[in-house]
Amino acid sequence: MPTQPLRRAVLRRSWPFAALAAALAATTLVPGATAAGRATPSGTGKVVPPEQGTWVGTYQDATGPRVLKQTRVQDLEETLGRKEDVDHIYQGWTSEFPGWREQWDNLNGRVPFVSWAKASTAAINSGRYDGLIRQRAADVKAAGFPILLEWFWEMDGARNHHWAGSPASFIAAWKRIHTIFARAGVTNVSWVWCANAWGYVTGDAQRYYPGDAYVDWICADGYNWAPGRRGDEWRSFQYIFQSFYDWGSGRGKPLMIGEFGVQERKPGEKAQWLKDAADTLKTKFTAIKAVVYFDVKKRYNWRLETSSSARNAFRALAKTLQPPSTYP
C-alpha cells in the first residue's frame, strides 16, 4: 500500500553481520525458533516455498523505536499462537538494507520480505543508479541468508505511471537491477514481482511482467475496499484474487499475496471474510504459497484488532494454512 519512496535510517553498509547476528541472538531470539522448511540449509540459496500449506505473515506499523517494532511482531505471534512465517518490511529506494530487522527475522525463523521502493525507471535505465544497486547487491550477499525482495510493487497503478513509465521501460529497469545482482554473485535473493490484483482483471498487470527468467515469485496486492471507499461493493477474497490466480498459477512459480486487507462492516462480516479466505486458500488457491496481511490503519482500518471475532478468524486462518512440520 505505501506508494512513495520511504526514507529510513538503518545501519551503515559496513556493519559487521557476524557481530550483529551475535548481539541479536543473545537478546531477541525466540526459544525454539526455527527456519525449517523455509530456506536452503546453507542460507545462501533462494527462499524455498513450502511443499504443502501456505505461509502466513503480516505488515506491522514501522514507526517507533526498534523495541516497539519487535514488540508488535511478538504480540501478534502471541495472539496467533504460532510464529509468523513472513515479516513484511518496506525500505526506501536509497535505504541501506539488510539491517537489524531482516537479521532479527532470520534469527527468529521468519522469512524477511523486503519491499524496495520505486525509483524512476528512466533514471535506472540511464545507469544513474548502478552504483547504488551494486551496493544493495553487495549488502544482500554479505547478509548470507535468504530474502524475498520485491522491487516497485503495484507498478501498474495509476499513481505509479510517472515513476514506472511504459511497460517496456519498467521491464528494462527490472532486468537491469536483476542483472546487476546476478553479476555480483547474489544467490540468496528471491525476486517477487507484484502488481495490483485488479490489474490482472484489466490486463494491465501482465504488460509489466519481465519474464519467467527474471521472476521467482508472482504476487498480487488486493483489498476489500468496502465500505470505506465510496461506490465499492463488498467483495470476497476469491473474487479479488481470482484473475491473478488464473494467470499466475499457469506459470509454474509460487504465488504470493503481498498485501491484503478487509474492513469491518456489519458485526461478524470481517471475521467471515477471513474464514472464507482461509477456505479458498486451502481448497482452491493451492498454488499460493504465502499471504501477507496489511495489519495497520492507513486510509482505512485494516487492523486485525478491530474486533475479537476478526482477530480469532485470522488466528484460525494462520493455523489452517500452517505448513506441516514447520513448527514444533
What label would you give each PLM region?
Residues M1-R38:
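Secretory targeting and sorting signals
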Residues A39-W55:
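N-terminal low-complexity, Pro/Thr/Ser-rich intrinsically disordered segments
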Residues V56-P146, E269, W273-I288, F294-N301, ...:
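N-terminal carbohydrate-binding/catalytic regions of secreted carbohydrate-active enzymes
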Residues G57-D61, H178-G203, G252-R265, A290-V296:
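Aromatic-lined carbohydrate-recognition surfaces of secreted/lumenal glycan-active proteins
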Residues D87, L149, D216-I218, E259, ...:
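Conserved, mostly hydrophobic/aromatic
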Residues H88-Y90, A117-G127, H161-P167, R230-W234, ...:
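The substrate-binding groove and active-site-proximal loops of carbohydrate-active enzymes
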Residues G99-V111, S115-A117, A220-R265:
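Glycoside hydrolase catalytic-domain groove-lining segments
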Residues G131-I147, F152-W217, D221-I240, G268-E269, ...:
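Active-site cleft segment of glycoside hydrolase catalytic domains centered on the general acid/base Glu
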